[in-house]
Amino acid sequence: MKVLRDRETGTSRGAGRRPRRKREAKKTTLKKFRRRIPLYLSLTAMGSVLAGLIFTGALSVQGASLTDAIKDRFAFSGYLQSTYRQSVHKENPLAAIQRVGLETRFNQGSWIRGFASGYVDTDLSVTGRWHSREPVVTPEVGEAYLTIDTHYADLIVGMQQIRWGEADALSTFDLINPIDYRNPIATGRSTQRLSVGAADLRVSLKGLGLLDLICVPFPRFSRLAEYGSPWEDKGLRELRHYVGEGLVGRKYDNGPFEPEFAGRLKFFQSGYDLAFMFFKGYEHKPLYTAGIDYQNMSATIHETYKTFEAFGLSSAVSILKSTLRTEFTLRHNYPFQSDDIDIERRNDYEAIIGWDRMFLTNLNVNLQTFFSSYDGKKVRGKDRERYGATWSVSDKYLDDALTAGVRGEYFANNDDACVEVFGEYEYDDHLRFTAGYMFFSGGKSNDLGQYDKNDHFYFGVKYSF
């Protein structure tokens, strides 16, 4: 059984379950609060630092008001965005999201900078899914960090998106930021990611390259689709059903969790980049083992998180008008989820080769092939070899105001696929329109094939201010 983690247990609507549901709801709320303590602490500390900088900066401005000081040091912007996604197989929409987003940039002289972004989503489509436990309103922090800039090194502290992969779309080394499974599909060949609270030290190697050292003191784990969501994983839905019917119990791993560490040594010359990378941390989606609760004499599913190490090598080479990108990664002792509801460790080898080129004026072609394989005995439910391709082809029209194209990914080992036809029109510097069609294919139990009922059209408008 392929399962994922969630804190909200889906239960049947039969009689006699309500008291247990209330107790589990209280436990769930407490567990959610505990898991979010690192995020709350980091945001509180960051807010205190920003407030202190505003105060001290204002005092240092002679003959100027506090308002003038804030205007000199801060730049504010935001946007209003509306997105509608309608499945061609379902009556109810997949999403009808109204988003309000805000961003701010801060500068204190030349040595310290700050950036913060966040948004609030109101998804009106949730009201049409009567059995769903999705929230209608969802606030989210995008990124919020401070940068201390010196001549030889930069220190970046706060909530960040850290993407080290050289290859576009799929990457073997985007391991630091967990996938947001509440809405996992960003485009036809990329995933949504969550920011993490990290300290990132970047040391310049006198023009030869860069040394990047990262510590994530409180690991952040993937958020999963709520009960009844159109993006709810099939295995997760089954687990919730079994727990709700009282067929199995469920235990959670609430830590404490070890800090995560990563490092990158990158050399760059004209037309050539080479990087060596290291990661020691968690598989951010939950893993499950089955056992027996001898006190209650019942079957129990235990949710846990396991660590592993990864070593990688990446390069980017410019050849004529093209760029060739490669990534090779060893995920040492990686924890695979078995269909036997157990965790099996293997060494997993991954490789990506990508090529992109700009033809004519604006015709962009980006192709990628990937291959991965693990050693040892076969893990039940996991293909030993995974391979396929991703692509993106786009061009610009109407004086470069309209970008249109097609992008997607195909896993040849199991026929999983996601393809998106997309268009984006920039009316002016403030107003932007998007439209497209996305479809999925593959086996009903595959990662992408399970969403074949989510084939959909989408339309969006975004106004920036």
Where on the chain are the PLM-derived regions?
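Transmembrane beta-strands of outer-membrane beta-barrel pores
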Residues: 82-88, 120-124, 150-152, 161-163, ...
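Residues on the lipid-exposed face of transmembrane beta-strands in outer-membrane beta-barrel proteins
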Residues: 100-106, 143-150, 199-203, 263-267, ...
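Outer membrane beta-barrel
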Residues: 105-231, 270, 442
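Repeated loop/turn-to-beta-strand initiation elements of outer-membrane beta-barrel proteins
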Residues: 74, 110-114, 152-155, 208-211, ...
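Outer-membrane beta-barrel "beta-signal"
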Residues: 181, 439, 452-465
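Transmembrane beta-strand segments of Gram-negative outer membrane beta-barrel proteins
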Residues: 66-88, 106, 113-116, 404
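Detector for outer-membrane/organellar transmembrane beta-barrel domains
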Residues: 281, 316-338, 342-409
